[in-house]
Every structure is written in C-alpha cells, then in structure tokens.
Amino acid sequence: MFWKFDLHTSSHLDTLLEKEDLSLPELLDEEDVLQECKVVNRKLLDFLLQPSHLQAMVAWVTQEPPASGEERLRYKYPSVACEILTSDVPQINDALGADESLLNRLYGFLQSGDSLNPLLASFFSKVMGILINRKTDQLVSFLRKKDDFVDLLLRHIGTSAIMDLLLRLLTCVERPQLRQDVFNWLNEEKIVQRLIEQIHPSKDDNQHSNASQSLCDIIRLSREQMIQGQDSPEPDQLLATLEKQETIEQLLSNMFEGEQCQSVIVSGIQVLLTLLEPRRPRSDSVTMNNFFSSVDGQLELLAQGALDDALSSMGALHALRPRLDRFHQLLLEPPKLEPLQMTWGSLAPPLGNTRLHVVKLLASALSANAAALTQELLVLDVPNTLLDLFFHYVFNNFLHAQVEVCVSAMLSSGPPPDSSSETPVPNPIVKHLLQHCRLVERILASWEENDRVQSGGGPRKGYMGHLTRVANAVVQNAEQGPNAEQLGQLLKELPEEQQQRWEAFVSGPLAETNKKNTVDLVNTHHLHSSSDDEDDRLKEFNFPEEAVLQQAFMDFQMQRMTSAFIDHFGFNDEEFGEQEESVNAPFDKTANITFSLNADDENPNANLLEICYKDRIQQFDDEEEEEEEGQGSAESDGEYGAWQGSQPVRASQASQPPGVRSGGSTDSEEEDEEEDEEEDEGAEQAACGRTSPSSFPSPSTQPPGPSWTATFDTVPMDAPTGPPVSKEADMSSIQIPSSPPAHGSPQLRSQDPTHPSAPQEVTDSSKVAEPLAPCQALVSVADVQATLHGMRSAPSSLDSATRDPSTSVPDFKAHQSPQTMEGKRSPEHLGLPQSQSALEMPNGSTPGGPISSGSQ
C-alpha cells in the first residue's frame, strides 16, 4: 500500500539523474534508490534499464569481488543490485527475461569453480527465483537447453541456496501442464537417483543433508498436490520413482556401504521416514469428521476412516525388511561417541542422533502393521531392545516419546490387513509385549524404584510421565480396543502376586497420578454470588441501612420487571426519523409494559421492603391519631363521611381533575390560573355565572316547606384564619342538583350572597351548621332532621351580615356538635380550608337560595 498509493516523500534523485556524467555506483550510494525503484520512477528505470547498467548489476551478483577491494564493492553494491533486480518491477523482469546474454551471464555462476560463495549463491538463487515465478516459459525453455544444468545443480547441492533453487523450480511453476513438463524433464534427467547418490559416505555432510532434504521436499510436495486434487494429465513421475523398491534399495546400500557414517545413516533414515508417513486422502474424501493426528511430530488432518486404510509405501517396506537386522545392530552397537558430562552425572555412551533416528524408523515400521515386517521385528526382539533403552536413558525424553508411541501402537494394533480368517486371531505383538518383554513387571518395578529414590530425597525419574501414559495405554486397551479380550486374558495369566500388585497399582498410585494430572491448573471455585464466598473477611463489612433498603428496593423493581420493558422502551430506528407519525410511539409502548404483581411472592427483599414501608406509614398514622384526639368533638357527624343509613358519594371526585386536592386546593397550574383570574375580573365573573344557575336553583323552582337558618357569631380578630381559597375552587365545589328537594325539608339560604362560602341561616332552628367541604358526601333531609334533633332551638346571635373576608371565619369549635363519626378525619388533617360552607344535598342541590351572576 505504501508504494501503491505513492505515500513516499519526494526524492532528490530526479535532480541527480539530470547529471550527464552520473555513474551507477554513485546512484547506488543513494539511500532512497530502492524506494524510487519500487514506485516506478520513470527516470530512474530508464537509467537502470540501460544494457551496460543491467550487465553491471548482474556482474555484481554473480562475480566475486577481489578480497582486497573496498567494502562497498564486496557487500553494498551486490546487495543493492540484487534488491533492484528482485524488486518485482515488470520493466526489469521483462528486460532480464528477454535478454539471453544476461541469462547466460547468470547461468555462468553455476559453471564457476568447485565451491560457491554462499552470499553470491543466495543473490543468484533469489534472482533466478523471481524469473522462474514471473518469466516461467522463457526461463524453463532456457534451462532445458542447457544439458549440464542438473549436473551443475547436483555438483553444488551442498550449498543451501542451490537446494532452494531446485525447490523453487519444483514449486513456483503455476500452470499444471508446464509443471508436469518440468517434472518429466527432471525425471528424465534422473534427478532422484542422482540425489540418492549424494547420500554416500564419499560425499560431505552438507551434501548428505541437502540431498536428503531435497528428496523429502519432493515427496511431500508431490503428495500435497495429490491431496489438493490438482488435475494433472499424468501421475507424478518423481514420486513414483522415489517409491520404487529399487530406489529404496539403492538408498539402503549407500547407507551401509563401507564404514558406518552417522551423517549418511541419519540422512537416509529421514528419507525413509518421509516415505513411511501415512498417505493423507484426497480433498474430496475429507469430511467434517476429520480429526487431528500426530505423525512424526507433525499435525496432519486425517479422515477417521481413511487413517486405518492409509497404507505406507509398500516398496519401502519390502526394501526395509532385509535391512532390519542392520538397524537393530545399530541399537546394540552404536557408532563410537565420547562420554558426555551432564549435570546429573556422566553419560557413557550417549544415545546419539543415529540410534534416536533408528528408534524412530523401527517405531514407524511397527506402526505400519505389515505382517512380514512385524514378524521380523519380533524375531529380532526389537520391542525388548526399545524398552531396555527406555529405562536405561532416564532423562532422554526424545527416546521416551518414541518408545511410548511404539508401545501404544503395538497394544492397539489390529489384525494384519492380509488376514482372511473370520475368527479373531491372537495378536502376536501383544503376547510378545506382555510375556517376553515383561511390560507389566517393568512398569511396577520402575514405579517402586522411583518411589524409593524419591523417599530418600533423590530426583524423580525422567521417564515417569511417559511411563504413566504407557500404563494407561495398557489399562485402556484391556477395557476396550481391538485386543481387549486377549490383553485381559494375558493379565489374568500373570502370577498371582504380580496380578495383585498390578490391581493395587491401577487403583492406587496410577489413579492418584491421573487425578493430579487432570486437576485444573488454577485451583479456584467459581462463585455464583458474593454470598457463596466462604472467606470470612468478605462478610465483615457493615453497610448503612439506607443503602441496604435502597438496594432491596432496586432488586424488588428489577424482579417485577418483565422482558417487555426492554422490548418496548426507547425509539425504533425506523420510526426515529418520522417525527410527526411516531411522536406518541414511546408513550404507547410504555402503556404496554407489564409488571408481575404476584402477592404470594416470598422474596426476602420484598418482605424487607414491605416492613420498611409499614414502619414509615405507621408514623404518619400515629401523627394523625394524635391530631384527631386533640380536636375531640370539634367535627360534626356529617363533616367527612356519609350519614348513617345513606350511600356515600364522592361528588367532587368525578368533577375535579387529578391535580385538585380534596380540600379545594389545586396544583401549581391552577394557582397560575387563579393569578390570571385576579387580574381579569371579567373572566372570573363569567366562570361564576356558568356555575350559579345550575348550582343554586331559584326559589320559584323549589317547593314550599319549612326551612331553618344558621347564624354565626362574629369571629374575634385574633381568631385563626383559614388558608386562602380561590373563588374558582369554591365555585367548583358546588354540585349541580339532580332533582328538587322534598317538601317539608329544612332549607338553607345564603346570608351573604356575595360569596358562596358564607355561613348559611337555618330557618326553623337556631343550630349553627358548619360549612361543608366539597369532598363531603351527600345526605338526605331526613338525616339532617334526625341529626339536628335536640339541638338548641334559639337562633344564634351571630351577626349574619356581610363580614370582612379576612375575619369571616366562624368559630367552629364553639358551635359544633359533640357527635363525631368514629374514624373520620378533621378538615385540618386533610388540609381543607375552613371557609367553605357549601352543604351538598343527596341530590346534589344546595339549600341556599339562588345566586345571580351579578352577586359575585
């Protein structure tokens, strides 16, 4: 991306390129020449693509400078020239691929002396690799014209860069047909046989290792292409040649010819191990049931059914069988090695790389489950030799891992593939392992010896981990597996004393070790809540009572909240842009919220919240009871409830809005309206006019009958006055009569027509009646007569004339009836103004006379 979008800074190379006498070394001394080349600087490319400059750069990467030259000539210029030639610029690639003289100059590097400069060889391999990848046709055609190309490659195969060039030639050809042509050409040149000839005691170690690595790469590359299912017109000729028995026999002959050479043996075994690797299936047979299987330390994806059917190279197995005794002899008589002084003591003789690779080869041969090969290994007593090495080299875990794999493969090996008998045939490997190799006895003896050494303060044996896995393999295969019946019978045939020791070992030390190995690395228990923690320090915190109650209330709310709250809360993305249509959508959704109101819930948090609320409510009840006791009989029987025998009706409840309190006071909104009405007197009179005709019927519409007048004494100036109440609130408390009062009922008429809350005059009795609040229930005339019976008949001497509003509060306590309904509350407790005196009749009428609209 840096080069693609031209994010580099401006360079002064353009100014430098304008010089007429500019030389190539002077240009290569610039630090940003490579960056300018990658961004395809036209002036720079024109300068570099000159034939003389291209030949100079090719000479720098192919010709070794004199040792006495400057450091820039020896290292800097060849390195910068190689980077420019391999910068993957199309113009440079085209110039190199089209100029055969430049290719000949490059090819001449292989025709130099016996040894190549490793640094120049890496430059040469890198340039040839970019040409193979970008100019495949031109370069392959050029190389096939050279008869000595394969000879030159094999001559310098000891140089790692040349081995990389051979691998690039095999892997960088993308077109299948051209790649197959390259493989056939190399097979015709007998490159496989000639690489095997390099694995010979007469060659040096570098040639051994590089030739072996090249053969292994050819095997893996060819098999990988088969797995990927790449269609090719012909089978891979190089792989077919490598898997032939004659080719393997040639390799084995070179390994054991003449004096033993560890490098030759190890390099040859690496090729054999690669050939014995199980073949992975083609991509079309791989399913979702694939699982990971470790083969020679590498993870390979194998189908479970194809793993057992995967056969190793039969040519390698047939060629390996006659040489098994030579490999077994290497285990018994290894090449001479000097003793090694280890931290735990002297190791004489060391195991060595040779015997370690031999153990790997024999383990792969046993895992192949070939009947003839297995029989030969049992005759040579190879399993017993492997166990001897296992217990002898205590701290060689490479050896322990290979022997463990070998023993596990032998215990779980099925019948030979070529066995045609329907009846199960005893597996000779399992019998040899338990009876001849005394596997169970060795496991018990080694375990007891380790316990004895550790009890004395000595170190633990290095093979104990692998020994545990071997013992588990015996137990598991005895319970289930292809040889479970045979293995169980062999365990029963052990001596009685050894059988008891084995059973005690399996149920005791082995079970304890397995339990320790399966315990989580972090020994903690997962806590579901803080109350599950057993740490006493976390239970000593004392939280304030308010915090506990607040948390309990929050828990109570969250537990009663259903999932509908989350689903219906907030705005929908689609409706958010539609402001006019969806303005009420959140309110509609909020109306659908449901909460659980189960009264039978026994949640401790809910109980705690209920107790708290009861305590606080009880405090208010106690205060109200004290106030009621202080007033005594200051309230009349009809102040706050229905008279006995009447139906209580809250007349004002249906007419008043939620904001109006029971005492006639309103919320802040109505207070604002009150201020507006005081400023505008006309609006106030209009409101009263709408109420008067319906609330106070005219005398002509009322039937004649006896009446009574209530009069009040003048209130002293120091008497407490009630709270101011708006005129609109007083008028709103007057109810519309539904029917005229009955004949003969006492009538109330207003002594002060200017205010509806003025005290009323009783016409047939002198008992003073307290004005009722708007929230009082309606009563019948009969109830009024029964209540007023026994009261004083003389009228009060109260002045019924119009009084000053500031002092027109009657003395209720002096004229109230001592009879007060039990359980009812006084107006003071409810915050009711005591200046309202509109007594509501059962039918909603007021006993007073009509009030005209102009009387306000």
Swiss-Prot record:
Record bears the keyword Protease: no
Localisation: Cytoplasm
Keyword vocabulary terms for this entry: Cytoplasm, Phosphoprotein
Residues found modified as Phosphoserine: 232, 529-531, 633, 636, 698, 739, 826
Pfam families recorded: SAPS (PF04499)
Assigned GO CC terms: cytosol
Region annotation (Interaction with PPP6C) ranges: 10-403
Chain intervals with Acidic residues compositional bias: 621-630, 667-683
Family to which the UniProt record says this protein belongs: Belongs to the SAPS family.
Role of this protein: Regulatory subunit of protein phosphatase 6 (PP6). May function as a scaffolding PP6 subunit. Involved in the PP6-mediated dephosphorylation of NFKBIE opposing its degradation in response to TNF-alpha.
Protein name listed in UniProt: Serine/threonine-protein phosphatase 6 regulatory subunit 1
Record organism: Mus musculus (Mouse)
Gene that this polypeptide is encoded by: Ppp6r1
